């Protein structure tokens, strides 16, 4: 085999292997983190169920000073909508509360527009136990090929998980005041 053919074939084989590995990743992804908060579920629920309260705890609101939000629909609960734009790390998109059970759970449809389009469901569940409420924040969505490819090089669970951990710590601080 000539040297030129080897030089061309090796990178092509490596790229093919990476693409094949990426294609074999699961079609659905899920990220989940939990936090114990010393507050009643009703207090925590109010912080999550109303998008106007998210700047008190949501990491993207705290990390990106260029982020701007617009609200529509009811102030809280099912049908509440928050749209955001940013020239920074938060990108742009829309969130809508699609299910809300007082003191128990909230489902939020999250549609990212930029930097990459994606459609996910965030779920917050609240499980009281004595004076402590266990809050679980999870996100599930379709693992598009671009995300599968990125996950070959970047641990997406760790990256999104840090965001959730920060948000839950902020939520804990806000709820325990």
Region spans (language model):
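Hydrophobic-ligand binding "helix-grip"
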Residues: 2-24, 56, 63, 83-134
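Hydrophobic ligand-binding cavity/cleft-lining segments
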Residues: 3-75
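Conserved short-loop catalytic and cofactor-binding motifs
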Residues: 32, 70, 85, 152-155
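Short, acidic/polar N-cap/turn motifs at the starts of alpha helices
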Residues: 32-34, 81, 123
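Extracytoplasmic/secreted envelope proteins and their assembly/folding machinery
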Residues: 41, 45-54, 79, 94, ...
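Sec-exported extracytoplasmic/periplasmic mature domains
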Residues: 49-56, 87, 99-102, 169-176
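Short coil-to-beta transition motif at edge beta-strands of beta-rich domains
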Residues: 76-82
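Beta-strand/loop substructures that line and gate deep hydrophobic ligand-binding cavities in soluble
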Residues: 109-166, 171-174
């Amino acid at each position: 085999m000539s040297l030129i053919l080897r030089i061309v074939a090796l990178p092509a084989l490596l790229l093919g292997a990476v693409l094949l590995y990426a294609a074999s990743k699961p079609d659905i992804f899920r990220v989940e983190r939990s936090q114990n908060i010393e507050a009643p579920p009703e207090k925590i629920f109010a912080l999550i169920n109303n998008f106007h309260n998210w700047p008190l705890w949501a990491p993207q609101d705290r990390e990106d000073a260029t982020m701007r939000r617009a609200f529509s629909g009811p102030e809280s609960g099912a049908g509440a909508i928050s749209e955001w734009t940013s020239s920074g790390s938060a990108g742009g998109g829309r969130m809508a509360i699609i299910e809300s059970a007082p003191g128990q759970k909230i489902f939020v449809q999250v549609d990212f527009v930029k930097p990459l389009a994606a459609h996910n469901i965030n779920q917050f569940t609240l499980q009281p136990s004595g004076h402590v409420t266990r809050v679980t924040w999870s996100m599930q969505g379709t693992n598009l090929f671009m995300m599968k490819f990125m996950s070959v090089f970047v641990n997406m669970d760790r990256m999104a998980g840090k965001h959730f951990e920060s948000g839950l710590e902020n939520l804990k601080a806000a709820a325990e005041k």
